[in-house]
Design a protein with these regions (language model features):
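Glycine-rich phosphate/diphosphate-binding loop of Rossmann-like nucleotide-binding domains
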Residues: 31-50
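A short beta-strand-loop structural module common to alpha/beta enzyme folds
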Residues: 55-66
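Compact, glycine-rich, soluble single-domain proteins
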Residues: 90-108
Length: 131
């Protein structure tokens, strides 16, 4: 979990490289969802993405209060299913549980990534629609 500004800024810079590729992003709306452990990073990502002219569909959570991560992974899947967006970002403490929850849905191809190269390759070569 990235919690300080230096790491958050680095993450946002890497995210910009990943999502700047025109053929990678076909729509400009990105769905964001997180559990309580991911809330601080999600809040930073919202500001960054808004500054890059992305539309944001925020599915929560909106506080540090403890919540069940599967609820937010499932909400992401439903948002992709009903067409609110084609891509999304999930954030939790490790990324593992929320990715597993989202991947239960046929239309979700969530990849757990740790760096810009992994994220970029997941999008370009594996057609991941959620990172």
């Amino acid at each position: 979990m990235v919690q300080n500004d230096v790491h958050t800024n680095l993450f946002c810079a890497r995210l910009k490289v990943i999502w700047d590729v025109e053929e990678v992003v076909t729509r400009r709306t990105i769905v964001l969802a997180c559990d309580h452990a991911g809330f601080p990073l999600k809040r930073s990502l919202q500001g960054f993405l808004a500054g890059q002219d992305f539309g944001i569909c925020d599915l929560g959570t909106n506080s540090n209060e403890s919540v069940d991560y599967p609820d937010f992974g499932f909400a992401m899947a439903r948002a992709l299913e009903d067409g609110r967006a084609e891509t999304g970002l999930l954030v939790c403490g490790s990324g593992i549980g929320i990715s597993i929850a989202a991947n239960r849905y046929v239309q979700v191809r969530a990849a757990l990534v740790h760096d810009a190269l992994g994220a970029r390759m997941s999008r370009l070569h594996n057609d991941a629609n959620v990172i």
